[in-house]
C-alpha cells in the first residue's frame, strides 16, 4: 500500500484496476487521453468551425486509440461529421492509401494523434496526396523536436498541459528557477506536471494526521483543488483523475505559440 501519483500518465487505465474500478492508492495530476480527445473535438468544432473531420491513428497504441475514439464521439455529438477514420500499424512507412482516401473525403481538419517521430513524414505524405486541411494533434506533439520539421508542422494545432508564457506568478517563478538551474532551458510539460505533483504531495504531507501511509493517502484524497503551474487542478469527490483545462498551441513560423485554453464543460 503505497500512494502513487502519476504526473504524466494520460492512459485511462492508469487509475483503474482490472475491473474498471478506481484504484484506491493511485492518482494523476494530468488530464486523461479521453479528456483531451473531448477537448480537441470542442476546439475543432467551436474554434476552428470545422464540420468535417478525418482521423488517422494506430489502434494498437492505447493513447492514440482512446483519443481518436473520444474525438470522434465528441465531434459527432457536436453536430460534426467524421468523414474518414483511418488506421495504420506500428512500423508502417507508407500511408499514401489512407491519405488518398482522406483527401477525397475533403475534411476541414485532420486529427493525427501520432508520436512525434512519426508526424513529419506522415504530414509530408498527406500533403503529397492532396490533403489541404490543417492538422490537429494530441499532447504527443508537445516535443520540441518537431520544430526541426517546421515546414511540415507549420499551422498545426495541438494540445498541451501548460503554457510556459502564462503571466501567473507561479508560472514565472517556476520557469525562472528552472531556467537558472538548467542553462536557460524552458521547462516542458513533463517538468511542469512533476512540479505540481510534488507540491500536491507536499500539501498532503503537511495536512496528514501522521506520516503513516494510510494517513497520507487519506490527506491526498481530501484535496479538492490546487492552483499549480499547469492551472487549476480539481479533484471531484476524491476522484483519482483531475478536472482541468487543456492548453491549445500552434506551430507557427518556426515557433510554438499559445492559442487558447479549453475549459471543462
Predicted regions mapped to residue ranges:
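An alpha-beta-alpha
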Residues: 18-87, 109, 201
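Extracellular/periplasmic periplasmic-binding protein-like sensory domains
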Residues: 11, 23, 123-195, 206-211, ...
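Hinge/beta->alpha junction and helix N-cap segments in small-molecule ligand-binding domains
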Residues: 8-14, 28-37, 57-67, 85-95, ...
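Solvent-exposed, polar/charged alpha-helical surfaces in well-ordered, non-transmembrane soluble domains
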Residues: 38, 42, 46, 65, ...
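Sec/Tat-exported extracytoplasmic proteins
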Residues: 8, 44-48, 57, 71, ...
